[in-house]
């Protein structure tokens, strides 16, 4: 699924803060109840233990519905369904009207401005050809 894989690999939410509700242990580190934790969505969505070859873009990926680009459970973004629908429409229209998409800069030149909550490119310089 193109939309879900784009969301997984380019998670729009940088992180969220949560409070541990009980004493826990994660990777050998004790986490007492009441500890404030920062959940890095992009790390979770690229975790090789959760997604085979988590750094790779693969629209045929299994278990894609387990990605957490918009959070999870009661904390899930209320606009997630709308955002997904907007992406579906945008990709469909772009593919219907244009061809030969190309990134106009080296990927290393793409810049994500610092933001505590959200993650998005400052610019996406691309070129394409209109369909006739």
Model-derived features: positions:
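Cytochrome P450
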Residues: 1-132
């Amino acid at each position: 699924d193109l939309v879900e894989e784009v969301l997984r690999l380019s998670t729009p939410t940088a992180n969220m803060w949560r409070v541990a509700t009980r004493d826990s242990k994660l990777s050998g580190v004790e986490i007492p109840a009441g500890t404030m934790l920062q959940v890095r969505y992009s790390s979770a969505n690229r975790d090789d233990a959760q997604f085979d070859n988590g750094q790779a873009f693969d629209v045929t990926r299994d278990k894609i519905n387990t990605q957490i680009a918009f959070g999870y459970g009661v904390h899930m973004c209320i606009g997630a369904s709308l955002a997904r629908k907007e992406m579906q429409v945008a990709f469909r229209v772009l593919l219907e009207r244009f061809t030969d998409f190309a990134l106009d800069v080296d990927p290393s030149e793409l810049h994500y401005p610092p933001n505590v909550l959200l993650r998005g490119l400052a610019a996406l310089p691309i070129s394409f050809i209109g369909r006739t």
